[in-house]
Amino acid sequence: MADTLPPTDRSCDISQPLERLSPDEALKAGSEYLRGTIALGLLDRITSAVPGDDIKLMKFHGIYQQDDRDVRDERRRQKLEPAFQFMIRVRLPGGICTTERWLKISELACAHGNETLRMTTRQTFQFHWVLKHNIVPVIRGLHEVLLDTVAACGDDSRGVMATVNPQFPALQAELAALAKTVSDHVIPKTRGYHEIWYGEERIASSEPEEPFYGRTYMPRKFKIGFVIPPNNDIDIYAQDLGYIAIAGKDGKIAGFNIAIGGGMGRTDKVPHTYPRTASVIGFITPDRLISVTEAVMGVQRDYGNRADRSRARFKYTIDDKGLDWIKLAIEDRAGLLEPARPYHFTSNADIYGWVESDDGYHHFTLFVENGRLNRDTLDKIARIAHVHKGHFRLTPNQNLMIANVATADKPKIDALLVGSGLIAFNEHSVLRLNSMACVAFPTCGLAMADSERYLPTLITKIEGILTRYNLQDEPITLRMTGCPNGCSRPFIAEIGLTGRAPGKYNLYLGGGFHGQRLNRLYRENIGEAAILEALDEVLRHYATERLPDEHFGDFTIRAGIIREVTEGRFSND
């Protein structure tokens, strides 16, 4: 295979000895397929933390060690260790959640997660504030409803996303099933997870424990998603591997356009890191889905940078090797790709409220600001779950869909929504409905500034500006993160804010309305007053100078307010 490809630099990839690569590669190789000393660390009651190497390995199990950063300095003054706790992320392909699973997850969140639950931008749940001795009860509780946390984090294939669009129920169901098939295929196969968390015995076997990943897994995380045009709700161009469904004349999926190399993360003041939108390289029929997925991931596994983790994502492999070389490498493994087929996107937002699909079912999308569910909201949704005969869908915009409600059952669900006050989306501005924020403070160890806790307040102030210029009904996407890693995909928002320090943010403008274009830095390291001043000026021009139906991001480029980003590698210019 590889000997048919043009020569390429392999000085940083899996072909090199471990001593020439990042220390993380040796850690993975020596971990006994992600077992490490995790089981022993959980037994240590002297500390509420786990050993450093196990912190990294536990990510492959869907678990992050964190601490309460609001009290970190005070605990340091008192000579106490940080208030360690853990975030646990569920594997939930396509964001599909049965009512039984919802009730169990809600129960676990209230018992072990500080009575709060977070829906994420990748259509799954996160438990926060879980103490070390409660990790096993949470994971075993999930196992009771056949859920797990395998590969929700770590250098592997993360949770697989799929469009949530009730207007195409048959296509949506087909796509969700394919997302689960791919997810089940690409997760690590090590039995270490079962041994550590379920207490199973290790069984000797002559079969390879990780036939695809090997001992060192992927160079970095690898994200896969499926989308049905015209709604780009999953932000397909932010995926390492994106499948754009193309419908046939029979109403079924005829195949997929393949988009590769998307990714949001960057590091401030490090110009060789940058976000990138995925490149469409061809089309395949559904029967080739698994083989092509393996081929794309295999190319990144074998040629991705394992020496410098800041350059280890697939987007950098593509830009270093060249898109044509990468496509050749994929075709070398999986066969030739057909030319990409036409498609178009119109939005990446959710459709709120009730929608009736052509199969006669009804679906209600509930706005959940920044995906945060407190005890009161969990209890209200639990009452719906007890009577709902369909299922729930978590959306990529951190909202919740009550799916597949029969006409006869709609009045009952509607009464519960109205009676509980959950129907409130029409009370929010269009800007708020099109906003997202990551968790950031106080739990995320990477955060430099607030995000989830601050964005609602900032939006209220921006709403005043929009009203002043009669723009309150204009759909504008706004996303905020507490650091430049980009978990809420801020670099493709029309307005993006990324944290630099407490109360300070970088302001980005010019992203595409449906996630098709990166934005560019407009103001650096500024506080609230400067953010509002900058937005006031730009929105004032937008109000008077925009063309009919011109989106805000498009206007900022046409008006010369910001230069268009044509490729991610030029976004720092």
From Swiss-Prot:
Siroheme binds at C487. Its cofactor is siroheme; [4Fe-4S] cluster. Gene3D superfamilies: 3.90.480.20, Sulfite Reductase Hemoprotein, domain 1, Sulfite Reductase Hemoprotein,Domain 2. One of its GO terms (biological process) is sulfate assimilation. SUPFAM superfamilies: Nitrite and sulphite reductase 4Fe-4S domain-like, Nitrite/Sulfite reductase N-terminal domain-like. NCBIfam families: PRK13504.1. Alpha(8)-beta(8). The alpha component is a flavoprotein, the beta component is a hemoprotein. This is Sulfite reductase [NADPH] hemoprotein beta-component. It comes from Nitrosomonas eutropha (strain DSM 101675 / C91 / Nm57). The gene is cysI.
